A protein has these predicted regions:
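ATP-dependent NMP and nucleoside kinases share a basic, alpha-helical "lid"
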Residues: 47-53, 58, 70-127, 133
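The conserved Walker
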Residues: 14
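Hydrophobic anchor at the beta1->P-loop junction of P-loop NTPases
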Residues: 10
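Extreme N-terminal, non-catalytic leader segments
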Residues: 1-7
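Small-molecule kinase domains that catalyze NTP-dependent phosphoryl transfer to phosphate-bearing small molecules
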Residues: 108-111, 116-166, 172-177
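Catalytic domains that recognize anionic headgroups
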Residues: 181-197
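Conserved lysine of the Walker
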Residues: 18
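Conserved substrate/cofactor phosphate-moiety recognition/catalytic segment
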Residues: 23-68
Length: 197
């Protein structure tokens, strides 16, 4: 079994399911004995990137900060899961080059479905003009051109998405077979306990 660190970079629109899937992967990998950290975009913005706005420059600065932390943890054999919209290709590509052991996971979901899942009411605020520069509404989201994994959360269950990610990590040499094919039946209960289902 390889215990080398790597970074899973979850990118996608707000409401696509990045945090939910990040928690699912975290739960599974911790159960297999891995050290795992999640860098959630919302949490990073309130701590590490407090004071940054949503201009292209500020968003890229936010991504560079997340990538810096991921790089440090990766070289110390930690699995990092960055769950951030990260709307611009150039910033994601910079993160890939900077970190090294990097797996881009595109959490694809139609904006109409993301709007339905909008528990924070952000799309509504953006539609009303109360939030400017909101990704997918009045600021672009540049889809990945060659992601390592594509997850379609409007078509797959959480369990299917988790298995898809784990199998791909095995194919890329980041996980051993025994880390992939563990029982995932406890996952749903854990996600319910965390309030994601």
């Amino acid at each position: 079994m390889s215990n080398r660190g790597f970074t899973l970079w979850f990118t996608g629109l707000s409401g696509a399911g990045k945090t939910t899937l990040a928690r699912a992967v975290e739960c599974h990998l911790k159960a297999s004995g891995r050290k795992v950290e999640i860098l959630d975009g919302d949490i990073v913005r309130t701590h590490l990137s407090k004071g940054l706005g949503f201009s292209r420059e500020d968003r890229n600065t936010n991504i560079r900060r997340i990538a810096f932390v991921c790089k440090l943890l990766t070289r110390n054999d930690v699995v990092n899961i960055a769950a951030a919209i990260s709307p611009y290709r150039e910033a994601r590509e910079w993160a890939r080059q900077e970190i090294g052991n990097f797996v881009e996971v595109y959490i694809r979901c139609p904006i109409e479905v993301c709007r339905l899942r909008d528990v924070k009411g952000l799309y509504k605020l953006a539609d009303e003009g109360k939030i400017k520069g909101f990704t997918g509404v009045d600021d672009p989201y540049e889809e990945p051109e060659h992601p390592d994994v594509v997850i379609e959360t409007d078509k797959e269950t959480i369990e299917d998405s988790l298995n898809h990610i784990l199998v791909r990590l095995e194919e890329l040499g980041y996980l051993a077979p025994e880390e992939v094919y563990e029982d995932t039946s406890v996952l749903t209960d854990q996600l319910i306990a965390w309030g994601y289902l």
